[in-house]
Structures are given as C-alpha cells and as structure tokens.
Amino acid sequence: MLTASLEPMSRAFIKEDAGDPDELPERHQSAAPNYVTRQGLSALRRRVDDLRERLGPLPGDGRETRELRRDLRYFEGRLASAIVVKHETGSAQEARFGAIVELRREDGSALRVAIVGQDEAEASDGKVAWDSVLALALMGARKGDRIETEDTGALIVTDIHYP
C-alpha cells in the first residue's frame, strides 16, 4: 500500500504572477559608457522630441502608447547618459572614436566605416559601434596598418579622417 505525504511545494516550482501578457519588457540599457558623436547627440535629442510629440495625442493605454512610452524611457536614459566625444577634424594619424576609416580588402575592394556610438551604429550605412569587434580592431590603427577580424578578414587602412 502506497501512502503519500503532501508537503508544501517549493516556491521554485510555483509560477509567480506573470503580470499582464501584453506587458512590454524594457529595452536593454547597455552598461558600457554611452559615447556619442555631436551628430549622435543631436539624433538622440530629435528621437526624444519625436517620441514625446507622437505620445501627445494618443489616448488611453493601448499597445502603441505603451511601446512609445517604453521607447521614450529608453531614449531619455540614453540621452541622460550620453558622453559627447570631441575629436579632431580633417586628416588624422590614428583611428579613434568618430573617425571615418577607409579600408581595402584583400580582393582590392574598398570599405568605408565610421566609428560611432552604440545608438548611432548602422552597418548598412558603414557606421560601426565603438565597442564592436571591427571598431576595437581599428582603434589606434594608422594609415598602412593591417587589421584582421574573423568577420572581415584582413583589411589595410588606406585613410583616416574626421568629419
């Protein structure tokens, strides 16, 4: 004969209140310093202004309103933590934050990247975040230097300048 003893179940196996299924998770704020170019700071300000304007006429607490509020909290946080990095203009000896770096691949094709802040990065526009693998490999590089990453292969720095 089997007898069972009913003991309280461990809290680890009890699902806590999951909250509203439509609740949106907050956007992740990077723990890395929020370095931005002057253009990046302006873009963050425009983004915050745009979100505030779009939120103004929206009634209630629908999904769109909650998404806009979440995005506004994110970009207000990014704006508040922004550290503008000033850089030289014109030609430069070394690649640093804000630099536009001209590169040549082994096959002879050209590549141009700008080292920018995390929120400014847009690979399709040649803008790479300062903490990306490629940007970190480029930091301190000089004209004629060869850098290599797993994703890009070997690249030769052909020019460095600042906007």
Enumerate the language-model features and the residues they cover:
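Non-DNA-binding regulatory cores of transcription-related proteins
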Residues: K86-L155, H161
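Charged, amphipathic alpha-helical segments
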Residues: E76-H87
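Helix-rich terminal scaffold detector
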Residues: M1-R78
